[in-house]
Regions:
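Active-site-proximal loop/helix of nucleotide/amide-processing enzymes and allied scaffolds
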Residues: 1-34, 41
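...with weaker cross-activation on analogous glycine-rich loops/strands in unrelated enzymes
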Residues: 4-7, 73-155, 160-163
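Short, Lys/Arg-rich amphipathic segments at extreme N-termini
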Residues: 39-48, 164, 172-175
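Active-site nucleophilic cysteine motif
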Residues: 44-64
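Surface-exposed patches in mature extracellular/periplasmic domains of secreted proteins
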Residues: 68-72
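Glycine- and charge-enriched low-complexity intrinsically disordered segments
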Residues: 155-181
């Protein structure tokens, strides 16, 4: 059995060893908390563990040393009409802005699985500006990009514009964001 990124992240979160049983076949593996952190780029998607908000939390912690709360969220919450981003943004230290600069949280309403438009904003990413990540050495610059993690896909940097800008419903800045970025 090979532990997934979600297994390893969850093991770290709980702080206890995990025993993994592969099914079918019965292969086993044991993992222990050893400081594992999922990569910011190319991470697997697992809702509630490695999703777009988890990526946002990890970016803020690694790049700016800001710890964001891990709010409870069940899969498909965006279809209920309540925007968890709007509900929790102030509690997490964010406020709305009209301009866009590095480190801002870009909240969007994009088509969900099956192509239907959700009832509430359901996706977020971090605007990178120059596209660089200090926690990812050797990464080439990619001006105008943002970091995000779409449902069922691997996390990526994409150019912020076009569809992404059209689907943006709010831009949020953290109260502890550096003045010059």
């Amino acid at each position: 059995a090979t532990p997934s990124m979600a297994d390893r992240v969850s093991c770290e979160l709980h702080g206890v060893p995990w025993f993994i049983l592969g099914w079918p076949g019965g292969d086993t593996a044991t993992i222990k908390p050893e400081g594992y952190e999922a990569p910011l780029l190319e991470r697997e998607f697992h809702h509630g563990i490695l999703d777009c908000y988890a990526l946002v939390r990890d970016w803020y912690a690694r790049e700016w040393g800001i710890d964001l709360p891990n709010f409870p969220r069940r899969d498909g919450w965006w279809n209920d009409g309540e925007s968890l981003y709007e509900r929790y943004c102030e509690e997490a230290g964010f406020y709305r802005v009209g301009d866009l600069r590095k480190g801002d949280l870009v909240v969007m309403q994009i088509a969900a699985q099956g192509g239907s438009m959700p009832a509430a904003p359901n996706h977020a990413g971090v605007y990178l500006g120059d596209g660089l990540l200090s926690s990812v050495p050797g990464l080439h610059a990619a001006p105008g990009t943002f970091l995000h993690h779409r449902y069922g896909k691997k996390s990526s940097r994409d150019v912020y514009g076009g569809m992404w800008a059209e689907r943006t419903v709010m831009i949020l800045r953290h109260q502890r964001a550096p003045e010059e970025t």
